[in-house]
């Protein structure tokens, strides 16, 4: 375990000029305040740094705005993007009066979920492996004014540029719709950029594995190694930061929106989960696909609470433009070995250590701390209450006849439905005080503001369909 003194030693050895204290707001956005190194000492690590939390959506009101950033020495790493030597440290949020963890701090919630797992006796570690996809565009323009609403995206990879005149000529070699998975360059035009992203991630302490082009034009994925829940939530925040920064350095712009382009695949964030105890995997056994009974119950919990989970795993109105049949979107609440059309998949693996559940409906707009914690709580509720998921569905669920299809439950169809589902189904989250009602209520209120704005704003497609009626 890295101590404050060890971090202070690293600061001297690396001639660090600034320390960037970072934390995550309820929406999942990384925030920061930069400290001059002269202010960084043992007292800062012991007492934390006061800041005004009233400007953070979903947090305290202006009359009780003081909060404490408490640096976590374990998370210290160098930021290669700044001109001045800068160390980054992730922080927890504390209440200055009680000194306790602030109940609406997402990272604090994730820590409580890990502690709840240990206290349950079911396991001592949950490993999480997220697979976040993203788009990179050459140019993006959007406007959401009352009299000017719309957007325009551009990338040299888009099929719409087949006949575009470029100064150096149009060289062709671009992926077709749903054809980006995964030809070599020059069809894949972003090999070097993704390699740079992976290199920087490794330099910042993230264990990397691979990268590749994704199904849609201008869509990509980086592969990082699984880790414990809080650590990999931290790493997912680093992942998104690096993707944005490297794309920017290449003169491009990256987005984790699930569905920026109609008619092509959207970006998901499949999440692999496995529980271990005393250094041994608990999900391996003699049941279906080599799973243990507790793993099946875990899946049962995910399926039972999926609609409530959607509020955290798919927390944007745009999320539900991805969660529609026909675009490899896992909308059907079923489980299967290897079958990618099911929302819960059991990846193939003969080694007991490889036994895990892949939850396929999350997307990268999720706050990783809240989403990972919520999925763990749903799975633990399944184990505690022995919620068997029923028979596995090994056929292609997309090709089922309508009569059979109607029998399979689905994920939510909108953010409004997800928030309403969370409001009704929350007891599994508040078990052990991991989440609490105040936190859930404030999250619903925060996200319902987005729903209302989206539902009340006229859409360009409506003009296309109705203007001349």
From Swiss-Prot:
Gene that this polypeptide is encoded by: glnA
Protein name: Glutamine synthetase
Cofactor(s) this protein cannot do without: Mg(2+)
Extra facts: Two forms of glutamine synthetase (GSI and GSIII) can be found in this nitrogen fixing bacteria, GSI is a typical prokaryotic glutamine synthetase whereas GSIII is a divergent type with very low sequence similarity to the type I and II enzymes.
GO cellular component entries: cytoplasm; membrane
Described function: Catalyzes the ATP-dependent biosynthesis of glutamine from glutamate and ammonia.
Organism: Rhizobium meliloti (strain 1021) (Ensifer meliloti)
Co-factor: note: Binds 2 Mg(2+) ions per subunit.
Domain GS catalytic residue range list: 106-469
Occurrences of domain GS beta-grasp (ranges): 14-99
One example of a Gene Ontology biological process annotation: nitrogen fixation
Enzyme class name: ligase
Amino acids binding L-glutamate: 265-266, 322, 328, 340, 360
Subunit structure: Oligomer of 12 subunits arranged in the form of two hexameric ring.
Catalytic reactions of this protein: L-glutamate + NH4(+) + ATP = L-glutamine + ADP + phosphate + H(+)
Entry keywords, A to Z: ATP-binding, Cytoplasm, Ligase, Magnesium, Metal-binding, Nitrogen fixation, Nucleotide-binding, Phosphoprotein
């Amino acid at each position: 375990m890295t101590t404050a003194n060890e971090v202070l030693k690293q600061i001297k050895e690396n001639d660090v000029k600034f320390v960037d204290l970072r934390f995550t707001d309820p929406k999942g956005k990384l925030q920061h305040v930069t400290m001059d190194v002269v202010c960084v000492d043992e007292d800062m690590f012991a007492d934390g740094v006061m800041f005004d939390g009233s400007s953070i959506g979903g947090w305290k009101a202006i009359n009780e705005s003081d909060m404490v950033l408490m640096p976590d020495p374990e998370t210290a790493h160098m930021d290669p993007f700044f001109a001045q030597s800068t160390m980054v440290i992730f922080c927890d949020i504390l209440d200055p009066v009680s000194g306790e963890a602030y109940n609406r701090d997402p990272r604090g919630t994730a820590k409580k979920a890990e502690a709840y797992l240990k206290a349950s006796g079911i396991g001592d570690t949950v490993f999480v492996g997220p697979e976040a996809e993203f788009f990179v565009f050459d140019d993006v323009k959007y406007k959401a004014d009352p009299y000017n609403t719309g957007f325009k995206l551009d990338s040299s990879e888009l099929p719409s540029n087949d006949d575009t005149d470029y100064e150096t000529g149009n060289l062709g070699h671009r992926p077709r719709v749903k054809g980006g998975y995964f030809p070599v360059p020059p069809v894949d035009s972003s090999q070097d950029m993704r390699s740079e992203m992976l290199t920087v991630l490794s330099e910042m302490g993230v264990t990397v594995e691979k990268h590749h082009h994704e199904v849609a034009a201008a869509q990509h994925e980086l592969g990082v190694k699984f880790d414990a829940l809080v650590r990999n939530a931290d790493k997912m925040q680093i992942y998104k930061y690096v993707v944005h920064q490297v794309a920017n350095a290449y003169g491009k712009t990256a987005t984790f929106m699930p569905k920026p382009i109609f008619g092509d695949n959207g970006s998901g964030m499949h999440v692999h989960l496995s529980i271990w105890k005393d250094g041994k995997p608990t999900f391996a056994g003699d049941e279906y696909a080599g799973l243990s009974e507790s793993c099946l119950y875990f899946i049962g919990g995910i399926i039972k609470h999926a609609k409530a989970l959607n509020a955290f795993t798919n927390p944007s109105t745009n999320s539900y433009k991805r969660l529609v049949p026909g675009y490899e979107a896992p909308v059907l609440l079923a489980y299967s070995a290897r079958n990618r059309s099911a929302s819960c998949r059991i990846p193939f693996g003969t080694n007991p250590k490889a036994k895990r559940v892949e939850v396929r409906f999350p997307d990268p707009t999720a706050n990783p701390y809240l989403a990972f914690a919520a999925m763990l709580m749903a799975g633990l509720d399944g184990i505690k209450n022995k919620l068997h998921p029923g028979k596995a569905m090994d056929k292609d669920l997309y090709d089922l006849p309508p009569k059979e299809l109607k029998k399979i439950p689905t994920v939510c169809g909108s953010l409004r439905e997800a928030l309403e589902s969370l409001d009704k189904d929350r007891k599994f989250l508040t078990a052990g005080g991991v989440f609490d009602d105040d936190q859930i209520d404030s999250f619903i209120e925060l996200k319902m503001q987005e729903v209302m704005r989206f539902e009340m704003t006229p859409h360009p497609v409506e003009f296309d369909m109705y203007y001349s009626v």
